Design a protein with these regions (language model features):
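Conserved tyrosine-mediated DNA breakage-rejoining catalytic core shared by Y-recombinases
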Residues: 183-225, 235-236
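Short, basic (Lys/Arg/His-rich) helix/loop patches that form interaction surfaces
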Residues: 155-158, 256, 265-297
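N-terminal core-binding DNA-recognition domain of tyrosine recombinases/integrases
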Residues: 27-37, 47-135, 151-154
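C-terminal catalytic core of tyrosine-transesterase DNA break-rejoin enzymes
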Residues: 168, 172, 176-179, 287-297
Length: 297
């Protein structure tokens, strides 16, 4: 009997993988599959639990991480100390963020169970928060939406005009997600229609361009002749990159989109304070409002 066989027969303990290296492999696979939103979320989940363990590079053996007690400690740490993305925000993560990170870990755990790395414990995540906390109602009332539609954009501060225009276009384009608006190409406009592929599903969509949307498109379209995009949302340094002989990769474009999304939502908050005090505006609101008003029409 070989030494290796003898160790297996005697039940020699198998070295457990480290969570950081394992999750990094998962993230790389998600990026290879172009599931960038999931890869982005997993990356932040990994940064969070690494911070809980003392910072990047600290060992995180999976058999220690995936225990009810350790997961509960991590949850309590996130509630108390988890760092916000914005520096000025207080410590402590929202319930939705805690749930997202825990559900990411749960998915990683199930992947390890499927690969026989860890045994299955059906109650492992029973004592930690994995629900999705319902947020403040996202859909606007008809009167509130009409307030935005009837706003004279010229009376807004210059940095807010295009933000409200994009929000209105998302609504007028049948609740188009911000990511699809950002990735719209000039060639997607076919007369009075837009034909494009959903970024999330790849499904081809066709939307009619209402008169109000056509006017907004003319005013806020991308005026860079070298850009393929309909609106100047992605990579404002596009022409500079081309002159330097550089072409942005998909991942870089997605990071540009995330930066644009953060700025978009921050400015929507300012618009809400000016036009709809007490109402929360975000990129999701246009989509939810269109769906709600269309349903009740």
């Amino acid at each position: 009997m070989s030494k290796k066989e003898k160790n297996v027969e005697m039940g020699s303990p198998m070295k457990m993988p480290d969570l950081a290296s394992y999750m990094q492999t998962v993230i790389e696979q998600l990026e290879a599959d172009k599931k960038r939103s999931a890869a982005h979320t997993y990356t932040y989940a990994l940064k969070s639990i690494a911070e809980f363990y003392g910072g990047a590079g600290m060992p995180m053996p999976v058999d220690e991480v995936f225990t009810p007690g350790r997961l509960k400690e991590y949850e309590e740490w996130m509630r108390r100390e988890g760092m916000r993305k914005r520096k000025r925000e207080p410590k402590g993560l929202s319930l939705n963020t805690i749930s997202t990170y825990m559900r990411n870990l749960k998915a990683v755990y199930h992947r390890m169970v499927g690969e026989k790395v860890l045994p299955y414990n059906p109650k492992l995540f029973d004592d930690v928060y994995t629900k999705v906390e319902s947020q403040t109602k996202r859909a606007l009332e008809l009167e509130q939406m009409n307030t935005l539609l009837c706003t004279d954009l010229r009376k807004l501060p210059s940095d807010l005009r295009c933000v409200l225009a994009y929000f209105l276009l998302m609504f007028l384009f049948r609740g188009m997600p911000f990511i699809d608006l950002a990735y719209l190409r000039k060639q997607d406009v076919k007369g009075n229609r837009i034909v494009y592929s959903r970024h999330k599903t790849g499904r081809q969509m066709t939307v009619r361009i209402p008169k109000e949307a056509m006017e907004l498109m003319k005013e806020f379209k991308n005026r860079n002749p070298d850009s393929i995009y309909l609106f100047p949302i992605l990579h404002k340094q596009e022409s500079k990159k081309k002159r330097a002989g550089k072409v942005k990769k998909d991942k870089e474009l997605y990071m540009d989109y995330l930066r644009a999304l953060r700025g978009f939502n921050l400015k929507l908050e300012k618009i809400a304070s000016l036009l709809l005090p007490g109402v929360k505006l975000s990129s999701y609101v246009a989509r939810h409002t269109w769906a709600t008003l269309a349903f009740h029409a």
